[in-house]
Amino acid sequence: MIILAFESSCDETSASVVLRTEVGFTVKSNIIASQIETHRLYGGVVPEIASRAHIEAISRITYEALGVAGVTLADIDLIAVTANPGLIGALLVGVNFAKGLALANSIPLVAVDHIKGHIASSYLLENAPKPPFIALAASGGHTAIYRVDSYTKIKTIGTTRDDAIGESFDKIGRLIGIPYPAGKGFDALSREGFIKATGDEEKFYEKYKKSPAYKDKEMTLPSPALSDGSLDFSFSGLKTAAINLLHRFEQKGEALDRSLFAARYTFEAVEAVAKKIKMALEENPEMGFVMAGGVAANSHLRRRLTEVCHSLGRDIFIPPVSLCGDNGAMIAAQGYYEYLEGNLADSSLNASALDSVE
């Protein structure tokens, strides 16, 4: 089966051609038109601008994806498209374009939930996970833990009660001079801080908690892991405390070591996620773990969650960094399983900004 898939839920327009055989998935093309440079001017995504950019890009990248894959629309067996959640204007561009192609060429169409798509990025791995397993979806808009019972049925077992981890990195990163989106720069600056704090270029994360920098009361930040026994997070408190810390340094006229600050912020965020993932795995014996979403590209989070899984003897599945962000290939993978379940869409398909993962 050859699948053509579209992703346009936020600020990246993607079209991908994926081949599914008895062996598994093969990504034949995965074209992504990024809007980062455009939105960087505003310090974040502007929905109206994002929608217009999707309109300008989607036809071009579709034919580029087909060309790179060496196929035509006549070869396509299935079209998949992200229908929710996301920016409504952005989603509508992808949904309407996909519907038009499907109807005009008599190709079956399936709608895909964006979060399920992120989790499905792991199905593109050579050694792909099989449900049931525990999954983390961490991005600029989501931070949640799921129990994946089957390829199409998942249940939310933990979530953020306010801000997403990626949004907090972007906000705090901007305040210390890291250009939007701050994820990659924050990761690198944190690494610099960890090494500075420990003097170790290899085991810097593991040694950080015993370093003088961690014990510095001027840099104290709260954990976003709620202590109520749930698997939920609250990143707003961490973010607010970090903003107040920055203001204190500014008011006292003291120079802030950006790298040590970034390391402390990253450590608290990552440790909170690690704590909840460990709890989730302990509550679900023998299940493996999938890490997905844009923040899954964070090297410190990847490192720490790998350590957690190994300590519990669980398998961990992490997509390559190239598949952590929004892309069409992950939508194709999930679309395949929606098709097998008979979850076909028709001309009445509409986009929704709301999360309906369950």
Listing of model-derived features with the role each one plays in the protein:
Residues 2-85, 114:
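N-terminal beta-alpha supersecondary unit
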Residues 13-19, 135-137, 143-147:
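Short beta-strand scaffold segments in enzyme catalytic cores
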Residues 30, 72, 188-289, 298-312, ...:
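A contiguous, well-structured pocket-lining segment that forms one wall/lid of small-molecule binding clefts
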Residues 73-83, 285-296, 317-320:
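Short glycine-rich phosphate-binding loop at a beta-alpha junction
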Residues 111-112, 289, 306-331:
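Conserved phosphate-binding/catalytic loops in two-lobed NTP-binding clefts
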Residues 112-134:
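Conserved phosphate-binding catalytic cores of ATP/NTP-utilizing and phosphoryl-transfer enzymes
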Residues 127, 150-197, 239-240, 244-250:
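Glycine-rich phosphate-binding loop plus the immediately following alpha-helix
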Residues 320-357:
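Glycine-rich phosphate-binding/hydrolytic loop that grips phosphoryl groups
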